[in-house]
Amino acid sequence: MKIAVYPGSFDPITNGHLEILKRALNIFDKVIMLVAVNPNKKSRFSAEERVAMIKEAVNDERVVVDSYQGLTVEYAKKHGASHLIRGLRAVTDFEYEFSLASANDFIDSSVDTVFLMSKAEKSFINSSMIMELYQSGVDVSALVPASVLKRLK
């Protein structure tokens, strides 16, 4: 069984994240969506809320949702995952993601990173932008799943 970990803050999860997940499921038998917990980063939603939003948005037995504080590559190894999934919205994401993948490879070269490009129509979507638009009164219902929308209201 090919298992991948798709880590992220998912604060909140967006339709862009879900599009990357859908494509990852075409490659892997199981994907673990891993909510990253970073005590040094202020989150809009708690880890528990983010896990709940993802579980409500994703109805697929091939997807497991979990949260973790620590090195993602170590989590992947512990849970039998051979790959990490990273979504790229634009070329500007690549430099940071490449550095992260290189660091993960240094820690454990048995876990590879797979980069999936966002579809052009979803490349502008990110969690911070969603929150800014929502707080400005813009309807974001086309950009986030219903599980997020109900928590924004």
Model feature map: region roles:
Residues M1-K153:
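Nucleotidyltransferase catalytic core that binds NTPs
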